[in-house]
């Protein structure tokens, strides 16, 4: 035994935030002396064998660091170098060893981790040279020794990483699946759900949305008493001067023996279900690599089909990590998962314990089950909670009103409605009422794209647009005076009710939050699905995209305006200014326009317009698109047109424009320039969506103006007569 082995070791054991208390308990159970906890870590004293035991057996730790130096007042790189020089590195690093420095933190003068790592490395090299030892080589990928350095508020910790990588990497999870949990976080959730004690009693465990199986595999490793790092082929402490090979081999033999016995003695059966065949395949492959495939029953099944496994009696644990809609557009698909889960649990798993991990507790409460405990965790950057919920057959009383302390759950993943709170039922009733009101008009017109609901009830500030068998939902951002949690509850109510009333699948509902847009923001992508589909409007075929952009490519309120343009266009030269996706040009061309020019500044929308033209077989030599600032183009254009449509944005400050556009301030100038391009006897159709728009009196004095706004709303927009303004303007 050398001097290092004979001395107590000071250790820092790092872990994810929120796991510190659990890790301290785990270390104490191992027999280590816990000396303190800090954010994302625990300090402990241990001998060499105990340090090895922590590396081999900890289910919660990320790293195990042998502390070599702690100092305060480290702000400058020179002080960092000098601190590193004071460590006797020769007592820990073997001659000829390669190293890498992992630097965490910063100071006023050390702002980049790479610079901090370089400073520590320089100090180590200086110290080794001063001691007459060989300079260590740097190997960032596979070093023999990994140096851990942490600097926070001038406090420096330098140490030797005994693992050489993160302990959450068990080696089995090569097929990660969608949004996987890290293994040590999964283990922490299982511990909070009291799984180790439940496994000793032989209770079953079910994960109805198992994904790649991380929760199941970690649960099986616990139940079978298998060390999480038993299959790891290398630890950095094997290159440490103080390494004790005999102690390490003894620990490995002990762990292997426990695993052999544990696999035979497991009383619990574990069940994983997921609707995704690739996820089930990944879970099976991961379980095979973990060495416990016989302990887990994996089958494909949707949440709405969840049943208690055959032959399973008595209570057990249902633990799962459903998607929680961290991206807004996913919410319509996610909400029914939680309510379907609640319904199936009440029907099949009464008396069981549900451990539900979610980044959106309001979604968690959609199960209709009430949590008796909850624990805060971090899942990467996301704040999450583990809700511990006893499964009872009856829905909680809290669900009778959306105004209580907790939101209620509604119906399941199908369109079959279940119990609703008063607000949700009122919203559903309004949707039904609006459908009946529009039914005759829809049948007569043949329209399949229309607005069904537009903030009719102030509590549900949404616009609901139907596009055939798909639905586009926009939430108007609530004012600051509205409690955000109440707004979230009502939104979840609405997203659950909409597919039920309309008879569509939840994944056919696309949700966005609407805020004031300006400049590039109105063109910015919300997603990158590229998921577009064809709709019809009269004789026109048009592409729409409900997912990727704030707008869909088709302004439904302007439908009557486009219809009027089609009726006016026969034989005319047509100009479309601020053309967006070119839908007005398509209608004019189908109405017989001899040729057209469509002008817009956005490459995105001009490409969309070209696709719409191609879909309707418009001749590109007769129907041209031009990328330009409309104001600048009007000032330089020389052509005349018989019919002009101009629908400028209310406000735009795009960098591509020469100046900021404000339609109220600038419309007179725009109209004047457009009229200069209008042939005698022609018509300018001028429209805008400025709610409080007032036409400049000078326009009416110079030109013949007819306000046709009231005639440009179909029944689906008749409740919003201020949504746009429209004028026919002609030369006197």
Swiss-Prot record:
Its main location: cytoplasm. Residues 50-162 form the THUMP domain. It is found in: Cytoplasm. GO terms for cellular component: cytoplasm. SMART domains: THUMP (SM00981). Its EC number is 2.1.1.173, 2.1.1.264. Belongs to the methyltransferase superfamily. RlmKL family. PANTHER family: RIBOSOMAL RNA LARGE SUBUNIT METHYLTRANSFERASE K/L, RIBOSOMAL RNA LARGE SUBUNIT METHYLTRANSFERASE K_L. This is Ribosomal RNA large subunit methyltransferase K/L.
